[in-house]
């Protein structure tokens, strides 16, 4: 999108200015917390954690599973499932059009990806929410994918891990969406009865029907640092109760302090700690340890001045 400067500056000057920087576009990303400009290849190497302030940036579902699972032996589950507009829902835009736009922008069919694989050699089933797909909202396909993933875990008696990032139930699917809360809770009860471990990992943000169902039903409830977790958002609560909320209210650190979650794990530790926990839960040999991530942080270069000045 062009800004006011683009409108008043001749295109020739704009192009020459870009050429003088010598920095290709799209190589830098701004940290939403500290405002530092981060070199994308280094940011990816650091698992999308800001090396300046330690802020955990949001990542896509596939990126999340790529970080967490071993490279070999992955199998995507229920990849054929696609959402449909059974209620012919329309608000300011048709639901059918919203789905098409979300599928085009994310490359995913819906807001959940499920895979069977291993992490540090420990077999498991892992799910991850795609927040960029309609806010990671839970509709019929998300609920069905989660249930099928849990059933694979039941069939093979291997643990289930879910990374949540969601605004809640999908309003465009109305009662069909709300039913997924009961549906996912029911299959998790089956896992519990069979003694199959389920670990819930909450990432920024987790709200609504997802936080009120599968996200808070883990045998172990883990969160990333500074993740926003709750049922209604803080602004909605403040407008309702007409009071200022405590500092850090609904952040993972606040929830840990008040006993709502079991632990907070840094993204660098997530894979190793969960693998060790699952190995202990399932009486398997303890996995090894991974080398720490190390690199020198590159500072964003200044705009090169033209020669002769």
From Swiss-Prot:
Q: Where are the zinc fingers (C4-type)?
A: 31-53
Query: What does the record give as its pathway?
Result: Lipid metabolism; malonyl-CoA biosynthesis; malonyl-CoA from acetyl-CoA: step 1/1
Q: Which GO molecular function annotations are given, in alphabetical order?
A: acetyl-CoA carboxylase activity; ATP binding; carboxyl- or carbamoyltransferase activity; zinc ion binding
State its location(s): Cytoplasm
The molecule here is called: Acetyl-coenzyme A carboxylase carboxyl transferase subunit beta
Q: What Pfam families does the record point to?
A: Carboxyl_trans, Zn_ribbon_ACC
User: What cellular-component terms does GO give this entry?
Assistant: acetate CoA-transferase complex
Record keywords: Transport included? no
Q: Reply yes or no: does the keyword Disulfide bond apply.
A: no
Sequence similarity: Belongs to the AccD/PCCB family.
Quaternary context: Acetyl-CoA carboxylase is a heterohexamer composed of biotin carboxyl carrier protein (AccB), biotin carboxylase (AccC) and two subunits each of ACCase subunit alpha (AccA) and ACCase subunit beta (AccD).
Record-linked InterPro entries: AcCoA_carboxyl_beta, Acetyl_CoA_COase_Trfase_b_su, ClpP/crotonase-like_dom_sf, COA_CT_N, Znf-ACC
Q: Which reaction does it catalyse?
A: N(6)-carboxybiotinyl-L-lysyl-[protein] + acetyl-CoA = N(6)-biotinyl-L-lysyl-[protein] + malonyl-CoA
Required co-factor(s) are: Zn(2+)
Residue ranges occupied by any CoA carboxyltransferase N-terminal domain in the UniProt entry: 27-296
**Which residues are listed for Zn(2+) binding in this entry?**
31, 34, 50, 53
Q: Where is this region: Disordered?
A: 288-309
Please state what class of enzyme this protein is. transferase
- One GO process term, biological-process aspect: malonyl-CoA biosynthetic process
Species name: Marinobacter nauticus (strain ATCC 700491 / DSM 11845 / VT8) (Marinobacter aquaeolei)
Cofactor note text = Binds 1 zinc ion per subunit.
